[in-house]
Curated annotation (Swiss-Prot):
SUPFAM superfamilies: Glutamine synthetase, N-terminal domain (SSF54368), Glutamine synthetase/guanido kinase (SSF55931). It catalyses: L-glutamate + NH4(+) + ATP = L-glutamine + ADP + phosphate + H(+). One of its GO terms (molecular function) is glutamine synthetase activity. Roots. GO terms for biological process: glutamine biosynthetic process. GO terms for cellular component: cytoplasm. This is Glutamine synthetase PR-1. InterPro entries: Gln_synt_N, Gln_synt_N_sf, Gln_synth/guanido_kin_cat_dom, Gln_synth_cat_dom, Gln_synth_gly_rich_site, Gln_synth_N_conserv_site, Glutamine_Synthetase. The lineage of its organism: Eukaryota, Viridiplantae, Streptophyta, Embryophyta, Tracheophyta. Belongs to the glutamine synthetase family. It comes from Phaseolus vulgaris. Homooctamer. Residues 19-99 form the GS beta-grasp domain. It is found in: Cytoplasm.
Length: 356
């Protein structure tokens, strides 16, 4: 190993109780992630033990230069798979010095919804299928694709194996293990229909933790692709033409849905979602109209449709759920670049709190 590698992998706990905390927050675009580190005197297990911090919001598009300070509040802690030991990753949300959430802080409102007693009683579970595309850095073109050209048509790549079908698996597996190490409820990975595109799943996670875990999983993936020299894209339709887009299908259930007779509650919830289709679409990610065309396993963006085992529907119910008379459903509308705080809390709000 090189000296640099040796130093990167130093085990601090051999010589000190001090730990490094990497504070993570969402930047001005609402999708970009930012982070910086600080030294703490000793191990920490609860976010309430961590100090608030600040950053220059004028450099992230979140504050004017003459009043640039943005305050970040620690909200959840994960083990750091990069520094390891007692070092931690800290997901934060952002506020003005007066304590008001800034516009890109979608966690604040989500936390309000998830703390509502009616929502708490239903214990909403989420499983989010995060699709993404790996791009060659210099040409902004999917890995495994000839520069300026195209691979063979879709068909052999979904869950494919082999040097001519799976591109970037080392990144995918590194991310998988890093998420398990961090304490994220990552439940699986698979190659997607378009070559160079992959998916990981986070969940089941309850309430606000689904958003926290997905954002940290995205951060870890961004860090790994940084090391690999590959660009990570959450564009919902990275390549025009006869290629699948990238989504973030969101699986959802409440306690009532999971109990005997829950299928009736599932159908009732789907009817509510249909009545607020436009509002949900508006909040489900930028550029989603390029993906939701009615082709490539999607429903048309202007049409609300649900069905059993129908991957061309807005909402899909699994055959196992129909057979058992209880379970969960899948909202297939969210784009890969959606904010999980927005999507998860909006589904809970519509299905539990909203009265048509």
């Amino acid at each position: 190993m090189s000296l640099l590698s040796d130093l990167i992998n130093l085990n601090l706990s051999d010589t000190t109780e001090k730990v490094i905390a990497e504070y993570i927050w969402i930047g001005g675009s609402g999708l970009d992630l930012r982070s910086k580190a600080r030294t703490l005197p000793g191990p920490v297990k609860n976010p309430s033990e961590l100090p608030k911090w600040n950053y220059d919001g004028s450099s992230t598009g979140q504050a004017p230069g003459q009043d640039s300070e943005v305050i970040i509040y620690p909200q959840a802690i994960f083990k750091d798979p990069f520094r390891r030991g007692n070092n931690i990753l800290v997901i934060c949300d952002a506020y003005t010095p007066a304590g008001e959430p800034i516009p890109t802080n979608k966690r604040h409102n989500a936390a309000k919804i998830f703390s509502n007693p009616d929502v708490v009683a239903e214990e909403p579970w989420y499983g989010i299928e995060q699709e993404y595309t790996l791009l060659q850095k210099e040409v902004n073109w999917p890995v495994g694709w000839p520069v300026g050209g195209f691979p063979g048509p879709q068909g052999p790549y979904y869950c494919g194996v082999g040097a001519d079908k799976a591109f970037g698996r080392d990144i995918v597996d590194a991310h998988y293990k890093a998420c398990v190490y961090a304490g994220i409820n990552i439940s699986g990975i698979n190659g997607e229909v378009m070559p160079g595109q992959w998916e990981f799943q986070v969940g089941p996670a309850v309430g606000i933790s689904a958003g926290d875990e997905l954002w940290v999983a995205r951060y870890i993936l961004e860090r790994i692709t940084e090391v690999a020299g590959v660009v990570l894209s959450f564009d919902p339709k990275p390549i025009k033409g006869d290629w699948n887009g990238a989504g973030a299908h969101t699986n959802y259930s409440t306690k009532t849905m999971r109990n005997d007779g829950g299928y009736e509650e599932i159908k009732s919830a789907i009817q509510k979602l249909g009545k607020r289709h436009k509002e949900h679409i508006a909040a489900y990610g930028e550029g989603n109209e390029r993906r939701l065309t009615g082709r490539h396993e999607t429903a048309d963006i202007n049409t609300f449709l649900w069905g059993v085992a129908n991957r061309g529907a807005s909402i899909r119910v699994g055959r196992d759920t129909e057979k058992a008379g209880k379970g969960y459903f899948e909202d297939r509308r969210p784009a890969s670049n959606m904010d999980p705080y927005v999507v998860t809390s909006m589904i809970a709000d519509t299905t539990i709190l909203w009265k048509p």
